[in-house]
């Protein structure tokens, strides 16, 4: 067997389901701005760029249902549905755009 490369992942065969069993909220998002907007996997989606139009109350306490370390990019004029999952753990949101800075 060859030596492992630093950072290399060796997953088992088959598919992995991210956030298995977590409730999912689907929201329609439109970029009304004139520049692309990128939102990362663990950003509190309700606090995303103001140029994104969507139901922010439905997104409160949630993040994108995508792999950690990845992001979704919304080009100007784009409109698409995204899936969100609730933050877990202590459910404390601090930073981002400072709209909550505390417990959810």
Curated annotation (Swiss-Prot):
The keyword Transmembrane helix does not apply. Keywords: Cytoplasm, Hydrolase. GO terms for molecular function: urease activity. Its main location: cytoplasm. InterPro entries: Urease_beta-like (IPR002019), Urease_betasu_sf (IPR036461), Urease_subunit (IPR050069). GO terms for cellular component: urease complex. It comes from the Bacteria. Its EC number is 3.5.1.5. It is found in: Cytoplasm. Pathway: Nitrogen metabolism; urea degradation; CO(2) and NH(3) from urea (urease route): step 1/1. CDD domains: Urease_beta. Disulfide bonds: none annotated. It catalyses: urea + 2 H2O + H(+) = hydrogencarbonate + 2 NH4(+). Pfam families: Urease_beta. GO terms for biological process: urea catabolic process. PANTHER family: UREASE. Heterotrimer of UreA (gamma), UreB (beta) and UreC (alpha) subunits. Three heterotrimers associate to form the active enzyme. Belongs to the urease beta subunit family. HAMAP family: Urease_beta. This is Urease subunit beta. The gene is ureB.
